[in-house]
Amino acid sequence: MTAVQDPTVQRRRLRVELRRARDAAGLRQADVAHAMDWSPSKLIRIERGDVSVSTNDLRALLNHYGVKDKGKVNRLLELARSARGSSFYDQYADLLKQGYKEYLAYEASASVIRQYDPILIPGLLQTEEYARGLFAGFGRADPENADRGWAVRQHRQEVHDREIPPEMRFVLDEAALRRHVGRGSAMRHQLERIKEYAAEPYISIRILPFTRGAHPGMDGNFILLEFADPNLDDLVHLESINSITVRDDTELIAKYLDRFVQLEELALTPEESIDFLDALISDVSLTDQPTNSAEKEAV
């Protein structure tokens, strides 16, 4: 399976190319907007990747920048066309937090994914039973929303089926592994799935046990996305109760990358983590777990 480029990512690629072309021409945004008879905000939105640009506007813009190479012009025109398409995640916009649709598009294009989570099993590692247990706990107990939520998870997890999957590095807090989510043997199946993923050459899973005490990740989860494409800046994903923030701030990314390295060093080694998982799997009860209290309220 090959990666499908989301329009959100294509807009981001195009914006980098256009900013480079303007810089190479030695032009300011205000001068370009005036010459094109555009409002300054239109060019700003295009260069930020907030909006698509028509092929006619793009041709005029490239001509103004002195870009004459036909191969480059055609490549950028094709990029603009693909940037105007629809995203798989558009149909789930009502289900996703603000900013999450954009994050998912970037995640699918990343070459390296680093994630720390103190509470939940990351979506890229979740089983269907675990995911549906989460939806119930979040108050999404109705079948339609649960089905749609799982469809989003499934689409994300298609990265595992690529010929060359991204490198994935996870640090999981013991709390996320011990919290029973779902019913019956759901949690045992989830732990077994994590163990299976840990055996994959492109995945590193380290467990941060309670015995490590206080640590740098206690103030929340985060995800770092690294891209092989020079036209895509690396990103950090931060989450609050109502929204998702995706930042390309170099200093902020360096701060969180340093934090992730600290957490990896503090966590168990991959081999020790497998032994830890084996012990947890043995401890998990095979009897039905009680229904989540949040699920009771939502039904």
Please state what every model-predicted region is.
Residues 2-16, 20, 30-34, 48, ...:
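Interdomain hinge/linker segments and adjacent boundary elements that couple functional modules
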Residues 38, 88-89, 222:
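Tryptophan-centered motif/residue detector
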Residues 23:
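Short helix-to-coil "ATP-lid" hinge immediately C-terminal to the conserved N-box Asn in the Bergerat
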Residues 26-44:
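Short alpha-helical DNA-recognition segment
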Residues 164, 181-299:
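C-terminal regulatory/effector modules of DNA-binding transcriptional regulators
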Residues 37, 55-59, 234-239:
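Short acidic (Asp/Glu) and glycine-rich catalytic loops that position anionic groups and cofactors
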